């Protein structure tokens, strides 16, 4: 896929250049081509120290993407879920999650994605949610509209939690006090759905979901999501309502409407300072 002018805002210091966006799209194309033939095949699986699984596809894909970044922008930093950080204090840092939703990938569920993010001085500025098995792709750049499969994506209006469709990966990702806070929002929501991995954030950007609330999120989990959500007209913060950046985590909330975001934050924060 080639970058078009509508994807790139006018040149402003601190915003990604057309060359950076083109590389991000090339990385997403590479991820799709690499992962698709390996999906629902027999792959080696190991357990990381934190108990989560990692496959040979995760590690091999991240290595491929890192090599392409280093070849094109040798002064940029790279932070990845599997390979850690290199030049992590650089002004421009790429943030990679080669397979977000590894368990779904292992189980043959197509909701996993490759997340490609780019930060400038700790602020997420570019993000791609690439779903190789589904053929879905959201592209967000600071200062520019979000695109889904080449067409503009837009959140929907939703003023109140009582009118909202709420999504989260699952209850096991919350600590006990976090789950109690989440349950207050869940009890008030019109619809609540478990599962979906990062696909839920893309669906929020396209106006199908109103709220996504998660915990146990690291930089590689949320960096690419922020520009996608914001470029579609939504808002994504931590549970205190603060902007997300390189030092944020682990609790995140995304909303398509600032009004429902404010209501959900109030419910999450009852009797608790996050």
Give residue spans per PLM region.
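DPxDG-like acidic metal-binding loop motif
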Residues: 88-144, 163-164
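A structural micro-motif at secondary-structure boundaries
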Residues: 148-149, 155
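Short strand-turn-strand beta-turns centered on an Asx-Gly dipeptide
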Residues: 121, 149-150
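N-terminal subdomain of lithium-sensitive/metallo-dependent phosphomonoesterases centered on the IMPase/IPPase/PAP
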Residues: 1-99, 266, 274
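Residue-level signal for inorganic ion chemistry
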Residues: 35, 58, 69, 102, ...
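An extended, acidic
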Residues: 154-274
